[in-house]
A protein has these predicted regions:
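Long, basic/Gly/Ser/Thr-rich N-terminal segments
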Residues: 1-65, 72, 298-318
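Intrinsically disordered, low-complexity boundary segments flanking structured domains
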Residues: 11-18, 38-40, 47-49, 88, ...
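A generic structural signal for short, solvent-exposed coil/turn residues
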Residues: 17-21, 42-44, 54-56, 93, ...
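N-terminal start-of-chain detector that recognizes signal peptides
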Residues: 32-37, 71-74, 80-83, 197-204, ...
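Extreme N-terminal, non-catalytic leader segments
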Residues: 41-105
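Glycine-rich, often acidic-flanked micro-motifs
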Residues: 97-98, 102-113, 127-318
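Conserved glycine(s) of the Walker
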Residues: 116-118
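Post-Walker A alpha-helix
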Residues: 121-122
Length: 318
């Protein structure tokens, strides 16, 4: 099981044999929870409910259900990630709803809400040979010690890809083959979201290692952020384009994408942030070159080159 978690966690977290350090949280499967534990559950849209028992006194979290290796592995990874992200939040690390890509070697944070086109854009950039994904949907950011630069770090989270994105980038036949090969257990139930109308485009979950194999690429674990792009999908090609975001607008747009909690679920480990460090990161981000970029979904591969070209104009010394 540890080997399975290691594969899912790479390249963001490492798994090593040995006893946990005193006072650290443990995530346990295959053992009976002791008396006095508190029930905790995670219910994500389109997924089976994952049940835990939590021993707060001894800092232990026990996986209870569902059974089966794939769900146990996913459950252990999710809980481990939540523990680390809560610790990072306490240290003042800032979490944004954003993707992070190295576009022609330059770290670009792509900010946007759900279905803003972040994952499609990053995948298209990789296929174009110009991009390396660090993360596709949520990034943690930390200001450098001098307060000027910012480093973005990814986390081991499955990559949610629209089914029409797979069709667009790979063709319907290969997209069907890709979907049938995916191992995230929630893929067995996610189609219910499209059938119910909750997710009209449909979605599939790829683990990072599956993404790397599919795209024949490496995944970066962290990179310096050199530009911020507020990304959105245009309703028609005529609406596509890129404009700079002025200083007076930057704070408000950035604040819309700040995650108030470090995790979608399992915020039970303490996460009150260091306000000074978090504010330094916000200030550093507001000083970065910032743009709003709208693109037409069907033209995503062409639009990758468009954004890369406009950024190159802004950084002529490169």
């Amino acid at each position: 099981m540890a080997e399975s978690v290691r594969r899912l966690a790479a390249p963001y977290l490492t798994v090593e044999p040995g006893a946990p350090a005193p006072g650290t949280w443990e995530v346990i499967a295959g053992a009976t929870p002791p008396a006095g534990c508190v029930a905790e559950s995670v219910t994500a849209q389109g997924e089976s409910t994952v049940e835990y028992m939590v021993d707060h006194h001894h800092r232990a979290l026990f996986h209870v259900a569902p059974e089966g290796d794939s769900w146990v592995t996913q459950s252990l990874l999710r809980a481990t990630r939540a523990i680390h992200r809560s610790a990072a939040n306490r240290q003042g690390v800032l979490f944004l709803h954003a993707g992070l890509v190295e576009l022609n070697g330059r770290g670009v944070a792509l900010l946007g809400g759900s279905r803003a086109g972040k994952t499609s854009f990053i995948m298209a950039s990789v296929l174009n040979g110009s991009g390396t994904m660090v993360c596709n949907d949520d990034v943690s950011l930390t200001a450098d010690r001098d307060g000027d630069g910012v480093t973005g770090t990814g986390w081991p989270r499955s990559i949610s890809v629209r089914l029409d994105t797979l069709d667009l980038l790979f063709g319907r036949g290969r997209a069907d083959t890709i979907r049938s090969s995916l191992t995230h257990p929630a893929n067995q139930t996610l189609l219910s979201l499209r059938e119910s109308g909750v997710e009209p485009h449909g979605t599939a979950l790829l683990y990072p290692w599956e993404y790397a194999d599919l795209m024949n690429t490496r995944i970066g674990s962290a990179t310096k952020v050199e530009a911020i792009v507020h990304l959105s999908l245009a309703d028609s090609p005529s609406e596509a384009g890129m404009v700079p975001v002025t200083g007076s607008q930057r704070a408000a747009l950035l604040d819309k994408r700040v995650l108030r909690l470090p995790n979608k679920h399992l915020n039970i480990f303490g996460h009150e942030p260091d306000p000074d460090r978090s504010q330094r990161t916000r200030s550093a981000l507001q000083n970065l070159p910032t743009f709003a970029f709208r693109y037409a979904f069907r033209d995503v591969r062409k639009e990758v080159d468009h954004l890369a070209g406009r950024l190159a104009e802004h950084f002529p010394s490169d």
